[in-house]
Amino acid sequence: MEFYLSSDCASLARYVSKVVYLEDNDIAHIYDGELHIHCSKIGSEDFLFRTVQKLELELSKIKKGPYDNFMQKEIYEQCETTKNVMRGRVDAFTNRVVLGGLENWLTELRRAKRIIMIASKSSFHSCLAARPIFEELMEVPVNVELALDFVDRNCCIFRNDVCIFVSRSGETTDTINALNYCIKKEAVTIGVVNCSGSSISRFTHCGVHTNTGPEKGIATTKSYTSQYIALVMIALWMSEDLVSKIERRKEIIQALTIVPSQIKEVLELEPLIIELCDKKLKQHDTFLLLGRGYQFASALEGASKMKEISYVHSESILTDELGHRVLAVASDNPPIIAFATKDAFSPKIASCIDQIIERKGNPIIICNKGHKIWEQDKQKGNVVTLEVPQTVDCLQGILNVIPLQLISYWLAIKKDIGVDLPRDSAMSAPDI
């Protein structure tokens, strides 16, 4: 009998159909074709029993197929992965969200006096993107914490807090440390992960599985949008008993159902983005990304992707912070990418973009289809627009981040960078 060892079950899919997950303090002893599991704790000498589980991964999902690399494949899979995270959970006919993984903790979750979302890297950005809708629908304080900083500060956690832990792999060390800290404080914990057998999914009280499938590229793409939707669904589910939010919830649920088809429309921008990267962007090594409200999280995620994949310096800035010496940089003509889709902040964002144009900047504007406000500037060559479909404000960031994923990808391709294995990544390399 052969045994394979791995930190990620996806890498074993081509070799095995069954797996055993080890837990903390487990020691696996393989000898003479047999597996024995012991506990490393002093005084524990008995063998441990761990359940053998079926590995539910399709080999086709961890191959590139017709795509050049995994990152490109995973960007295009977002039409399907956003459907998968909602399948069986979002009912557009009754305007309800059903989350079976949380049902047993319904009473405790709806009694929450504070919600804390804890994550790292891109998962942290998805929490920032979802925070405003939690605050609006739940009407309780909502904190978003970087997992490492959260543990370092020994944050105050109480029994009536609900702590949501978001991780692509479910094995992020800093996030697991934060989870253990919150469990000791007796807070209710929710896991939002892609891997159902992961540490976070096993140790949290309840959770939501994003059903994203394996993400082989180092850069988080489809997991970000799936986490975003999963968090919005949690906010909708937890606020179901608030009568004052019924109409707002209906609006969001109806918008959720058409997000996958709208993503398909956004992906049609790829030829324009390829041309933009080739003619205007690839010679630059500094980028500024502007966003406000829901779109500040989009700016953060876009800047992170450009650093990670394209090896360029990119900075995300709140649009109204332009006056704090940022406009001085704009006159040096670094590419400026501004999120200007329609929401409560549109007039102020338009004013900031006008200031950039006055200083001879040539911003790239991500706006909604049919938004004619920059038509004259576009004809004069002062701006470039990337038009995306319009949706409800709290979901617009899902559509807005995809052009940034494509820009990061094609900048890297133009520079002959291996997008699936970027240098100096803090994450483990996938089995490609």
From Swiss-Prot:
Domain SIS, chain residue ranges per copy: 105-244, 277-422
GO terms classed as biological process: fructose 6-phosphate metabolic process; protein N-linked glycosylation; UDP-N-acetylglucosamine metabolic process
Keywords of this entry: Repeat
Keyword Hydrolase applies: no
GO terms, molecular function: carbohydrate derivative binding; glutamine-fructose-6-phosphate transaminase (isomerizing) activity
Name listed for the protein in its UniProt record: Uncharacterized protein EC1118_1M3_2531g
PROSITE patterns: SIS
